[in-house]
């Protein structure tokens, strides 16, 4: 079964349930036979920490890890020769950071990647990337009065300390990194949405960036989750509540509206329109009228 009880990702890969774990690689469950199949570093995974899994329209399977991103050509997981690992080094910096947190496919088959160092795109064998200097994430001066998390990760992590130094943020002693994309989504119009660590929500139309923060109506500037419902509406899970975006404005839901906790990490919409919202400590089921 699972090689780790820490779970980052649960989704579908064909008819099977795919689980990305914390230190235990990627596991797949066949619901009919109840048989598990596990893939880890010996099978080709870049890392045992798996944050997201995407099956592209062309059949390729992409796996986001903390040591780069795997691409399995044609989705043939059992054929080791089909496995590729793309890292900062192998892409000559096309992938801006090896810590990959999210994957999404665009309208034309391009693959978008959320990393701890910015946004990347893989299209027809070519890489592009965007970071805070190019428009990703709101500047510190715009969000500094609304940073709820005061503990600075760089004080306990050399990895985060190095990132802050590279960005020139040594004097910022709170949880803020606009290059760190925690959540990612691409809507039906091809707009890319990126949720950042303290820099709010960013919108990218392929040419220009727009930032949304507490000032524009978000409940919080740490954006942990992005969900597009069947109607195409964008839901934004933050450190301080859940927001529904419609016509450029945000409708906020908090514990007062039924959420278990205001820190929202996951969400899905059931067939009947019911919302299932995963938050710190529990899950809320919200029936929409």
PLM region descriptions:
Residues 1-289:
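Carboxylate-rich, polar loop motifs that coordinate divalent cations or form catalytic acidic clusters
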């Amino acid at each position: 079964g699972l090689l780790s009880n820490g779970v980052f990702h649960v989704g579908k890969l064909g008819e099977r349930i795919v689980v990305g774990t914390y230190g235990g690689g990627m596991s797949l469950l066949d619901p009919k036979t109840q048989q598990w199949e596990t893939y880890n570093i010996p099978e080709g995974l870049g890392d045992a920490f798996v944050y997201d899994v995407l099956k592209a329209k062309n059949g390729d399977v992409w796996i986001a890890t903390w040591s780069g991103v795997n691409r399995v050509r044609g989705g043939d997981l059992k054929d080791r020769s089909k496995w590729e690992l793309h890292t900062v080094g192998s892409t000559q910096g096309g992938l801006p950071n090896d810590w990959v947190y999210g994957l999404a496919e665009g309208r034309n088959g391009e693959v978008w990647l959320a990393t701890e160092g910015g946004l990347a795109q893989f299209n027809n064998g070519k890489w592009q990337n965007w970071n805070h200097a190019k428009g990703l994430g709101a500047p510190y001066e715009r969000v500094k009065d609304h940073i709820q998390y005061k503990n600075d990760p760089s004080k306990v992590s050399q990895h985060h300390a190095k990132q802050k130094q590279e960005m020139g943020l040594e004097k910022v002693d709170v949880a803020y990194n606009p290059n760190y994309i925690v959540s990612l989504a691409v809507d039906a119009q091809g707009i890319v949405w990126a949720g950042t660590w303290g820099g709010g929500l960013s919108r990218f139309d392929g040419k220009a960036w727009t930032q949304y923060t507490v000032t524009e109506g978000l409940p919080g500037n740490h954006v942990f989750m992005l969900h597009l419902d069947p109607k195409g509406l964008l839901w934004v899970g933050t450190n301080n509540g859940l927001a529904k975006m419609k016509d450029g404005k945000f409708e906020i839901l908090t514990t007062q509206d039924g959420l278990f906790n205001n820190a929202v990490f996951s969400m899905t919409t059931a067939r009947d329109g019911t919302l299932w919202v995963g938050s710190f400590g529990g899950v809320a089921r919200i029936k929409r009228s």
